[in-house]
Amino acid sequence: MAALGSSSQNVTEYVVRVPKNTAKRYNIMAFNAADKVNFATWNQARLERDLSNKKIYQEEEMPESGAGSEFNRKLREEARRKKYGIVLKEFRPEDQPWLLRVNGKSGRKFKGIKKGGVTENTAYYIFTQCADGAFEAFPVQNWYNFTPLARHRTLTAEEAEEEWERRNKVLNHFSIMQQRRLKDQDQDEDEEEKEKRSRKKPSELRIHDLEDDLEMSSDASDASGEEGSRTSKAKKKAPVTKAGRKKKKKKGSDDEAFEDSDDGDFEGQEVDYMSDGSSSSPDETEGKPKVPQQEDGPKGVDEQSESSEESEEEKPPEEDKEEEEEKKAPTPQEKKRRKDSSDDSDSSEESDIDSETSSALFMAKKKTPPKRERKPSGGSSKGTSRPGTPSAEAASTSSTLRAAASKLEQGKRTSETPAAKRLRMDTGPQSLSGKSTPSSGDVQVTEDAVRRYLTRKPMTTKDLLKKFQTKKTGLSSEQTVNVLAQILKRLNPERKMIGDKMHFSLKE
């Protein structure tokens, strides 16, 4: 450049030549300043391409003809790519990263990744000075950022899993030791508290350790004393009501029912609440005298005796004397019946049904008009009320009738046969009391019935016994089992073990 005006500055001119066609391509290697790269210490350097990603871009090699080939496979693959807009990238070695190894195997390793978009809006040139003093400018093609690779060997999947298990063991060990320390601390604190208690003055010494129990027992005794005084006052003011006695009776009868009952005993009673005909209207209940509502379920001998005791209080002393004379005889028999009822729940239910039917027959003979008859529902008598459920008329009848009915029932019980049972249960719906009893003719243990059940699906003996319940058939449990065994021998059904249980089935 020439000097400008009168300025005395010396300017040196350089010639820069830009070659049009060059075989060489220049790239820039960028290192991070934190890596502290010093080229003066490099004795040996090796640079090579990382071609490990070549497998990703390669297509599966399939034979075009012969065994294993597909017709027009390439054409169909191209059509699929066009349909979904898939553009395959070609594997270009110049786009792959560089691997730089310095000073042999023991030296450092660097990986250079190509930085895209560097030469889009800018142009970088490398100037080299020639022997004649002129500079040659070469454009930069690519820019690579080099980062050091980790020297340590990475773990494989199996090694990583082993290390993870070891870590869990170590953490568990630490947690266990921490728990032991906490326990030891708690024990030390407890021992210190005991020592402090033992060091107290002798005036504070107490013989009984359970202070809370003593306080609770004293409170309970005070409360029981107050309750006793209240009950004595209540007895002086008014006589004991029936409701209070009925609650006590319910507790005892509930316990007995739950102890003696078996699976499926009360399955036949599930339909009892479906009909509304047996439920009396509120107007009728207002007109009637209040009768205690007894619990649902079979009525035992204890309940009959208690209900008779209730009726004693309402009667004049003349009837009390007559009833006492009649009651003296059946007391040992009642004890015997209690033992029988605890042995077999099914037989107890059947005996209760028989007792009710016999009492109903006796009432029909005496022709004692009930206070008010309950209208049974329009359906069958079986669905309206449970067997053994006491009605309002049964509660209001005289005790003499009850005692005579219990005698009659005890006499019949000794010589009880299945045929007599059926006859008595069939005559039950004809009673004047309006009480409904289940008829024995509804379900019968027959060969056709068993065959019908077994052709539907495989069943166990327990399932068959549930189908033929004692309430429906009128037979005892032992008789039902014997009849079923004989029918199964005649039918000779197929036997299969399903879930560790023997199932019987028949084919049509």
UniProtKB/Swiss-Prot annotation:
Q: Which GO terms describe its cellular component?
A: cell junction; transcription factor TFIID complex; transcription factor TFIIF complex
Acidic residues: compositionally biased ranges? 255-270, 303-325, 343-355
Q: Which InterPro entries match?
A: TFIIF-alpha (IPR008851), TFIIF_interaction (IPR011039), WH-like_DNA-bd_sf (IPR036388), WH_DNA-bd_sf (IPR036390)
Q: What is its main location?
A: nucleus
Residue positions of the PTM Phosphoserine?
217-218, 221, 224, 377, 380-381, 385, 391, 431, 433, 436, 440
For this protein, the record's SUPFAM superfamilies field holds: Rap30/74 interaction domains (SSF50916), Winged helix' DNA-binding domain (SSF46785)
Q: Name one GO biological process term.
A: response to virus
Instruction: Locate the Phosphothreonine modifications and list their residues.
Output: 156, 331, 389, 437
Record keywords = Acetylation, DNA-binding, Nucleus, Phosphoprotein, Transcription, Transcription regulation
Q: Which residues carry this modification: N6-acetyllysine?
A: 407
**Composition skew (Polar residues), residue ranges:** 378-388, 428-443
Q: How is it modified after translation?
A: Phosphorylated on Ser and other residues by TAF1 and casein kinase II-like kinases.
Keyword Transcription present in the record's keywords: the answer is yes
Residue positions of the PTM N-acetylalanine?
2
Q: Where is this region: Disordered?
A: 177-446
Q: Where is the composition biased (Basic residues)?
A: 232-251, 364-374
Task: Return the Low complexity bias intervals.
Answer: 389-406
Q: Name one GO molecular function term.
A: protein phosphatase binding
- Where is it located? Nucleus
Q: How does it assemble?
A: Heterodimer of an alpha and a beta subunit. Interacts with GTF2F2, CTDP1, TAF6/TAFII80 and URI1. Interacts with GTF2B (via C-terminus and preferentially via acetylated form); this interaction prevents binding of GTF2B to GTF2F2.
Briefly state the protein's biological role: TFIIF is a general transcription initiation factor that binds to RNA polymerase II and helps to recruit it to the initiation complex in collaboration with TFIIB. It promotes transcription elongation.
Identify this protein by name. Answer: General transcription factor IIF subunit 1
- In its UniProt entry, the species of origin is given as Mus musculus
